[in-house]
From Swiss-Prot:
Organism expressing this protein natively: Xenopus laevis (African clawed frog)
Record-annotated TGS domain positions: 290-366
Predominant location: nucleus
Entry's Gene Ontology molecular function annotations: GTP binding; GTPase activity; metal ion binding; microtubule binding
Enzyme kind, highest EC tier: hydrolase
Keywords carried by this UniProt record: Cytoplasm, GTP-binding, Hydrolase, Magnesium, Metal-binding, Nucleotide-binding, Nucleus
Residues engaged in binding Mg(2+): S78, T98
Function as written in the Swiss-Prot or TrEMBL entry: Catalyzes the conversion of GTP to GDP through hydrolysis of the gamma-phosphate bond in GTP. Binds to microtubules and promotes microtubule polymerization and bundling. GTPase activity is not necessary for these microtubule-related functions.
PANTHER family per UniProt: DEVELOPMENTALLY-REGULATED GTP-BINDING PROTEIN 2 (PTHR43127)
This protein's name: Developmentally-regulated GTP-binding protein 1
Amino acid sequence: MSGTLARIAEIEAEMARTQKNKATAYHLGLLKARLAKLRRELITPKGGGGGGPGEGFDVAKTGDARIGFVGFPSVGKSTLLSNLAGVYSEVAAYEFTTLTTVPGVVRYKGAKIQLLDLPGIIEGAKDGKGRGRQVIAVARTCNLILIVLDVLKPLGHKKIIENELEGFGIRLNKQPPNIGFKKKDKGGINLTATCAQSELDNDTVKSILAEYKIHNADITLRSDATADDLIDVVEGNRVYIPCIYVLNKIDQISIEELDIIYKVPHCVPISAHHRWNFDDLLEKIWDYLQLVRIYTKPKGQLPDYTSPVVLPCSHTAAEDFCTKIHKNLIKEFKYALVWGSSVKHNPQKVGKDHVLEDEDVIQIVKK
């Protein structure tokens, strides 16, 4: 472990010394690829034994979505969780109170959302300091990350946490790079770009792939990509998670300062202690989770509007709905009757591939 950390420090120092220009792009690409490989060794150490990377921290996934609270010790994560979910996470006025993951559940708009108060991150978590590695391993399984910041401490904290999460392959508020990557048996590296590239050229791409011992592949760049984008695609273990920055303790700043904070993208100012602005926070959480609620209607009865079946927006076909209810339901599926915004007529007869929209009502007709 210490050998890997030393090599990471050497490469980071060399990258800091190297000026960024066209002439050094090849060399920097090579260094970035080496760095990514070493980081991967830290995330998944070689050799068996011991628990997984999130040992002792992970909590069984329940509900329709999972949110992780990440932040430095004593920024108010536990207070926020206890006031949001009514869970009493041990709150104290000294740093490092929460030493294991504390789960809570909040019900909002019919959805059951699991909240995880993850232990405070210290700088250097991605290098295995503190219990940061386990914390970040749990953060990778979340549908949304809330980075809780103390409004009085500068946004330097924000940068440190982002770097820690980035080092563990978590990309915040980003889409996966639009890069096609396909390994093949022969034919060398074949690079095609559908738009002008400011950073990547043939030599840089080859140097990065050579570091991964890939000498035959088809690469298609569909956007102006960076060396980091290409490395993310080759590594293939990146997770893309939406993120909200929660600025806590706004009771200690002026109205003018609050106006400035409101203009920062992905930010919600709150006071966990006074429960100020929780409505705004919950509304933003709902927007970022992009959940779809489907109501059920048993034959000959009124729809049940009390407990919707909640689906992620990427899987909202009638088939996904059936699978969520019971894995065998799809085998008995004949057709479905749907009322709501996804159909032209109410009700409309649809097949298993029909894509449902938020607050649709569905009745399944079995064979």
